[in-house]
Regions:
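A short, active-site helix/loop in glycosyltransferases that binds the activated sugar's phosphate group
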Residues: 166, 170-200
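Membrane-proximal helix-turn-helix segments that form the acceptor-binding/catalytic region
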Residues: 105, 122-125, 129-133, 159-179
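Nucleotide-activated donor-binding/catalytic signature segment of Leloir-type glycosyltransferases, i.e.
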Residues: 252, 260-283
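Nucleotide-sugar-dependent
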Residues: 233, 278-308
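Carbohydrate-associated surface elements
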Residues: 42, 185, 204-207
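Nucleotide-sugar donor phosphate/pyrophosphate-binding loop at the beta->alpha transition
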Residues: 137, 148-171, 210, 231
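N-terminal subdomain of nucleotide-sugar transferases
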Residues: 1-62, 240-246
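Conserved donor-binding/catalytic core segment of Leloir-type glycosyltransferases
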Residues: 5, 208, 216-233, 239-246, ...
C-alpha cells in the first residue's frame, strides 16, 4: 500500500475553504485504499484557542499536535495567528517551512509520496527538498501561480526578485514527478509560458462537498459576500460601483483579510461589513440573500482563477 503524506498550510478545524478541499481530497484517497496522513499548521486563519482545550487538537510533542478529519490522521505544526502584515507573513512562512522540513526529514521513512499544495508560494522550496534531498516521489498541486499574481497586483515591484522567484518555481515544477492544477487554462499556461511538459500535468477541478443552500423564498436585492478580503478580491471596486448605482441593492460582507479595515470604512446604509463569521452562521444568512458575489481583480485571469 502506497503511503501518501499530504502537505498543506491550512486544514480543518481551521475554517478555510482551501483547507477543507485538501482534507476532502485526502479523505477520498483514503477511501480508495491509500494510506494517508496530512501535515499542516495549527489553525491560524480563523484562530480559536478553544480547539486546544476541547480535544479537537491534542499535543504530541513540543510544537507538534495531532487531530483527525474523518478517517485521516493530521499532524499539526504549531503556527501563530495569521498576520496581514506582509513582512511578518513571510517570516511566518519561513518558520512553518523550517519546522515542516525538519518533520519530513525526521519522518522520511513513514511516507512514500509527498503531495504538496502550493499556498504559500514558497512551498516550492519544500517540493525541491522532497525530490532532491529525500528522493521522494513528489506531487505539487498549483492552485495559484506566483510570481505572476504578485507581479500583476504590484505586491512585488522588483524585477530581479520576480525573475529569481520564477526561476526557482520553474526548477521545482520541472524536477518533481507530477503537477496538479485546477483548470485547463492553467495547464496550457504552464506548457506555453513556463515550458513544463504536458504529460506531467493533471487537472483536478475545484468542487464543493457542502449541501446546496435552499433557495430564498422571496427574491430581494440583497447580495452576500463571504471569504477573504485581500488585494486579489478587489471588493472596493465593486462597492464603489454599487454606491454609484441607482438600484437600491444591499451588500452584506462577512470575512477577514489585509483589506478588512479599509473596506469597513466604506460601510453605508446599503453596505454592511462584518468580521469572520462561523460557517454555520453564514449558512443562515445565505438563506435571506438572492445573490452571491464572487470577486476577483480584473488583472488576474488564468494565474489566480478559479483558485481565488
Amino acid at each position: 500500500m502506497t503511503r501518501v503524506l499530504f502537505h498543506s498550510l491550512t486544514i480543518p478545524p481551521d475554517n478555510v475553504s482551501t483547507g477543507k478541499l485538501v482534507a476532502d481530497i485526502a479523505n477520498k484517497f483514503s477511501e480508495n485504499g491509500q494510506h494517508i496522513e496530512i501535515l499542516a499548521s495549527t489553525p491560524q486563519y480563523n484562530f480559536d484557542e478553544s480547539v486546544f482545550n476541547n480535544e479537537l487538537i491534542q499535543i504530541k510533542e513540543k510544537k507538534l499536535y495531532s487531530s483527525s478529519y474523518k478517517n485521516v490522521k493530521i499532524n499539526h505544526i504549531y503556527s501563530s495567528q495569521r498576520s496581514f502584515n506582509q513582512q511578518k507573513r513571510i517570516f511566518q512562512w519561513i518558520s512553518f517551512h523550517y519546522r515542516s522540513i525538519r518533520y519530513l526529514i525526521k519522518h522520511r521513512n513513514t511516507f512514500d509520496v509527498l503531495y504538496i499544495f502550493s499556498y504559500p508560494p514558497t512551498m516550492n522550496l519544500v517540493a525541491i527538498i522532497s525530490k532532491k534531498l529525500l528522493k521522494k516521489k513528489t506531487i505539487y498541486s498549483v492552485w495559484e501561480l506566483y510570481p505572476e499574481i504578485a507581479s500583476k497586483l504590484s505586491e512585488i515591484n522588483s524585477k530581479l526578485i520576480i525573475r529569481l522567484f520564477k526561476k526557482l518555481d520553474n526548477y521545482a515544477l520541472k524536477i518533481i514527478d507530477d503537477i496538479v492544477v485546477n483548470s485547463d487554462e492553467l495547464k496550457e499556461y504552464l506548457i506555453n509560458s513556463r515550458g513544463i511538459q504536458e504529460n506531467k500535468i493533471k487537472v483536478i477541478y475545484h468542487f464543493s462537498s457542502s449541501e446546496e443552500s435552499p433557495r430564498p423564498e422571496n427574491h430581494n436585492k440583497e447580495i452576500i459576500y463571504t471569504g477573504n478580503l485581500g488585494i486579489p478580491q478587489n471588493i472596493e471596486s465593486f462597492i464603489k460601483n454599487l454606491n454609484n448605482s441607482s438600484d437600491q441593492y444591499k451588500l452584506k460582507i462577512y470575512g477577514s483579510g489585509s483589506r478588512y479595515e479599509d473596506i469597513k470604512k466604506m460601510e453605508s446604509e446599503n453596505i454592511n461589513v462584518n468580521p469572520y463569521t462561523d460557517r454555520s452562521e453564514i449558512l443562515k444568512h445565505t438563506k435571506n440573500s438572492t445573490f452571491a458575489l464572487v470577486s476577483l481583480s480584473s488583472s488576474l485571469t488564468v494565474e489566480g482563477f478559479p483558485g481565488k
